[in-house]
Each structure stands twice: as structure tokens, then as C-alpha cells.
């Protein structure tokens, strides 16, 4: 056991973890690039309502949550590397469906259907990618550094959102939706080339509890994560339309502000969950997220909205890893992939449900109301986290 622990903390293991995280960054650009563009494509080019915008964005996360169990079993039983590489391939295929939606001379309903197919494929790929890379990273550096694994992967994900959002709007405005789709096809292939030679980690043996018994161990941190996720979901789905409705520019840079603050917090304070435990870090983070969403709700100018997005990103930054540390503590090694997949599924459910519900809210009460709803959810998340872990 000592030999294994020493091996998992070598510089070579850290470099392998970096390669995995950078590959996640490249692959997750397939999420970041189209995220601010899809609402514009659905609402303005296809002529559909806010609710349909919410469905187009949110359905990806339903696909992700429905395949989390499969992704966890794949990582636990057949190896995390296989799960991660399979996810990259699926993310690339999503771009092919969007390319067909852009190029085929078909009606708006058919284009929308192809867009949905691509979102479903992307959701499937995302579940394999994230579950695989988290389990892979834990196998490389060890469970005592689970916070680091989650922090690095989180930086990669939200760094991709920060870079991808304005780049996606730029590509779309200058070259069209087809060029955006083609770009999303290529990036996962580059990611595969970058980390394909990182060593495998063995699958753990031992008795494997049922999925529902694992969920019983992780639902409390998962619920806190889900309530946190509402804030990002409303920003990712409606920030472009919110800016357009106010006549503001720089909508893509809102996600850059969110993602940049997210990554900066991970760089400066990513060590905190391992050092202080997840609960305290999560509660403070949810307070910061609440402040950012309230600022977005009340923003009189684009610059204030950017500050609100940055505060929200700073608040969201450490919550996944903070509560994820609690998940790793609660489950045996042979089901870590299943547990992490199930834990992340709570966030996927939040993203998926928030899109269409927030769309109906925006139609009835205007775009600012969705950010107020996100702030209320974060406050509920604080209460849930405190009450769930009060005995600890």
C-alpha cells in the first residue's frame, strides 16, 4: 500500500494528470463553443420560443444523467481510460449532427431535430468523459488528493467555457453555424492524440453495491450540488438573450468572466477542500454565488452583469470538489466511478430541469427573473448543506 501511495504522488503522475485535464479542456470546448450560440440559432434563425431554447440546451444534460450509471460501471469494471476516450469520440460525433443541421436544405423542425440529436450525443459523450477522467485521475494520484483531481478537471471544464463562449460567438458571426460545428468535430480528436498514451489504471475488484445503494450514500452532497447548478444553468442558457434584450454587447464575455473567475479560484484556493473539508468551503462558496446572481438580476449595465457573472463563477468554482471530497469519503474504492458519476448526475439533472423551467419563467416575467431564481436556489443549497452535515 505504501509503494502504491508513493507512486501515485510522483511528478510523472502529476504530469499525466495535467495531460488528462488538458484533453478535457479541448474536448469540453465542444460544450463551450456552441453554448451561447445555440440559443441564438434556435430563437433567431429557427424562430422558436424561449421554452424551446431551454429544451435545446437542457436536453443535453438529461442525456448525460441517463448515461451516468453506464459511464460509472464502464469506468469501474473496464477501466477509466476506455470511458474517457469513448466520451471524446462521442463529443466529436455531436459536431457531425450539427453540421448536418447547418448544411442540409431542410425545414426548421428537421434542423431542430438534428440539433437535438447532436445535443443528446454530446450528453452521452460528456458523461463518459467526466466520469472516466475523474476516475482515471484518482487512480493516478490517489484518493487522498481527490480535491486536486476534481479541481484540475474543473479548471479544464470552465476554462473551456471561458474560452469557448466568445470564440464560439466569433466563429458563428464570421463564418456561420457550419464552421462552428466543424470545429467541434476536430477538437476531441486533438484531445485523443494528446492523452491517448497516458497509462491505464487498473479497475478495482471487490463486491460492487447496487447503484441505488451508492445513491443512498451520496444524495446529500448531490442535492447541494444540484441547487448550486441552477445558477450556471440560467447563465449558460439565457445570458445571450438577456444581453440582446437589453441592447448590450459582450454577451460571450459573460461566460468568459464566469469561467475566468472559476479557474482563478481553483488555482488560488483549489487546495481548500482537501485541507478544511468540503462543507465549510461549500457554504461560503454558495454565499458568493448568491451575491453574483443577485447582481445579475439587478444589473443596470453590461459591465455590472459581467461582474455578477464573475462572482457567480467564483462561487461555483469550489463546490463540485468541496462536496465531491465528501462523496469520495463515503464510498469504497471499487465503486468510485459509479459514485462520482452519480454525484455529477445531480448537477446534470439540475441543468436539464432548469433550462425549460427557466424558459417559461423568462417568458412570463422577463429574463432577469431567471437569475433571481438561481439566487434563491443557491440560498436553499446553503440550508440543505448545513442541515445535511450538521452532525459532522
UniProtKB/Swiss-Prot annotation:
GO terms for molecular function: transmembrane transporter activity. SUPFAM superfamilies: MFS general substrate transporter (SSF103473). It is a multi-pass membrane protein. Keywords: Cell inner membrane, Cell membrane, Membrane, Transmembrane, Transmembrane helix, Transport. It is found in: Cell inner membrane. Belongs to the major facilitator superfamily. YfcJ family. This is Uncharacterized MFS-type transporter YfcJ.
Amino acid at each position: 500500500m505504501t509503494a502504491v501511495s508513493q507512486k501515485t504522488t510522483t511528478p510523472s503522475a502529476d504530469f499525466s494528470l495535467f495531460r488528462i485535464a488538458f484533453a478535457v479542456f479541448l474536448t469540453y470546448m465542444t460544450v463551450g463553443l456552441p453554448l451561447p450560440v445555440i440559443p441564438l440559432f434556435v430563437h433567431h434563425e429557427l424562430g422558436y420560443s424561449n421554452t424551446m431554447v431551454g429544451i435545446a440546451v437542457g436536453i443535453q444534460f438529461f442525456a448525460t444523467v441517463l448515461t451516468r450509471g453506464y459511464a460509472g460501471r464502464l469506468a469501474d469494471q473496464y477501466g477509466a481510460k476506455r470511458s474517457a476516450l469513448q466520451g471524446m469520440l462521442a463529443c466529436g460525433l455531436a459536431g457531425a449532427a450539427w453540421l448536418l443541421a447547418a448544411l442540409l436544405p431542410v425545414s426548421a423542425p428537421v434542423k431542430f431535430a438534428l440539433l437535438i440529436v447532436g445535443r443528446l450525443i454530446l450528453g452521452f459523450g460528456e458523461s463518459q468523459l467526466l466520469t472516466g477522467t475523474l476516475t482515471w485521475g484518482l487512480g493516478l494520484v490517489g484518493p487522498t488528493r481527490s480535491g486536486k483531481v476534481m479541481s484540475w478537471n474543473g479548471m479544464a471544464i470552465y476554462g473551456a467555457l471561458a474560452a469557448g463562449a466568445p470564440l464560439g460567438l466569433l466563429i458563428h458571426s464570421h463564418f456561420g453555424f457550419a464552421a462552428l460545428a466543424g470545429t467541434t468535430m476536430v477538437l476531441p480528436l486533438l484531445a485523443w492524440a494528446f492523452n491517448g498514451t497516458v497509462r491505464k489504471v487498473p479497475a478495482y475488484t471487490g463486491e460492487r453495491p447496487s447503484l441505488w445503494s451508492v445513491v443512498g450514500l451520496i444524495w446529500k452532497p448531490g442535492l447541494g450540488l444540484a441547487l448550486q447548478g441552477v445558477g450556471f444553468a440560467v447563465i449558460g442558457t439565457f445570458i445571450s438573450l438577456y444581453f440582446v434584450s437589453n441592447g448590450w454587447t459582450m454577451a460571450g464575455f459573460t461566460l468568459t468572466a464566469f469561467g475566468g473567475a472559476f479557474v482563478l479560484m481553483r488555482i488560488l484556493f483549489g487546495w481548500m477542500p482537501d485541507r478544511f473539508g468540503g462543507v465549510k468551503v461549500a457554504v461560503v462558496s454558495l454565499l458568493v454565488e448568491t451575491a453574483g446572481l443577485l447582481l445579475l438580476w439587478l444589473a443596470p449595465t453590461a459591465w455590472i452583469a459581467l461582474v455578477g457573472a464573475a462572482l457567480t463563477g467564483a462561487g461555483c468554482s469550489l463546490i463540485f470538489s468541496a462536496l465531491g471530497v465528501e462523496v469520495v469519503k463515503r464510498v469504497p474504492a471499487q465503486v468510485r466511478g459509479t459514485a462520482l458519476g452519480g454525484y455529477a448526475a445531480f448537477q446534470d439533472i439540475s441543468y436539464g430541469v432548469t433550462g425549460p423551467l427557466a424558459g417559461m419563467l423568462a417568458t412570463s416575467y422577463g429574463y432577469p427573473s431567471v437569475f433571481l431564481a438561481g439566487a434563491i436556489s443557491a440560498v436553499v443549497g446553503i440550508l440543505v448543506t448545513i442541515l445535511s452535515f450538521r452532525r459532522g
